[in-house]
Amino acid sequence: MTAAAILAAAVCSCAPPHGAARAPAVASAAAGPAPEAGERHFARIRQLTFGGENAEAYFSRDGKRLIFQSTREGRRCDQQYVMNVDGSGVHRVSTGSGKTTCGYFFDGDRRIFFASTHAADTACPPKPDPSRGYVWGLDPYDIYVANPDGSGLRRLTNFGVYTAEGTLSPDGHTIVFTSLKDGDLDIYTMRIDGSNLKRLTFQPGYDGGPFFSPDGTKIVYRAWHPADTALTSYRELLRQRLVRPNRMEIWVMNTDGSDQHQITNLGGANFAPYFTPDGRKIIFSSNYKNPRSRDFELYLVNPDGSGLEQVTHHAEFDGFPMFSPDGTKLVWASGRSSREGELNLFLADWQP
């Protein structure tokens, strides 16, 4: 899900990709704010982006680059960009049309995939009617693959409904993602060529944001399974391509979809779970201490739900965490050191 929705709740190519343009020059990583009291896992923080909304930054397999989504170049909705881990070499890799989300490197960092709405409409999707309260729009994303400079764009899925939130298995062979293709928001896997499609979740409600464990045997995700009148309301909104995320908790399952079980019961919105590189803990974002606020913090928890520990201690949004492949760094999106309404990317040296 996009950064804007949550808040309301480098390859150097010799030419820009077709239909794309270089982003304006930006400063490379600057010394960021000092860690807040209690942020013992952060040895040093560096700021990577400066202005706008920037989120969902994911490392390349070699740990040298990041793909992320951003509103910049005067656009009203997110496009995909790649940069070096020091914040330099920023360039757009999506078409510049429609809205994009959830980019990821694959094929030995030789290709990327991301979700985009540009085939359905080149304009930004309309925002949900505010009279409906706090809802997310389920825009008609499909998943595309491209080269890391944005060239060679090819459509991987062709479902014509919300299909996004894709990430990659450790062996590089499987994409896990969320789709509305069968009428509900469920988690699926497929091979990187789009074959061998499998549905993993079947319980009514929103199952999404999946990531594989480092050993490839588990999938961690967020879920909300309403019941009774809440389920009726959920289905009515779904028909209108909307969802109201009243509550999301963290779940874990085997990669074949078996042994689905909830590991948090905190209340509020708990999302963006990601295993630590040793597989011993899960980091995620939550506003459970004040579910009506935008003050999301990062937390660690054991895979059995025990040992909850708060990681960030800043009165702004902190979310979308991802560890570098070697486990020495954490990248995440935060409102710290930013103007109101902005969200920037930060990189911290990680202390276990």
Language model segments and positions:
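A flexible loop/linker signature enriched in serine peptidases of the S9 family
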Residues: F50-E53, S70-Q80, T95-T100, A115-D142, ...
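Hydrophobic beta-strand positions that form the internal "hydrophobic ladder"
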Residues: L66-I67, I112, I175, I219, ...
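Short, low-complexity, disordered segments immediately C-terminal to signal peptides
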Residues: H18-A29
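Residue-level detector of Asp-centered blade-edge/turn motifs that repeat once per structural unit
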Residues: R61-D62, D107-G108, P170-D171, P214-D215, ...
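Multi-bladed beta-propeller domains
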Residues: A29-E53, N84-K99, A146-Y162, M190-Y206, ...
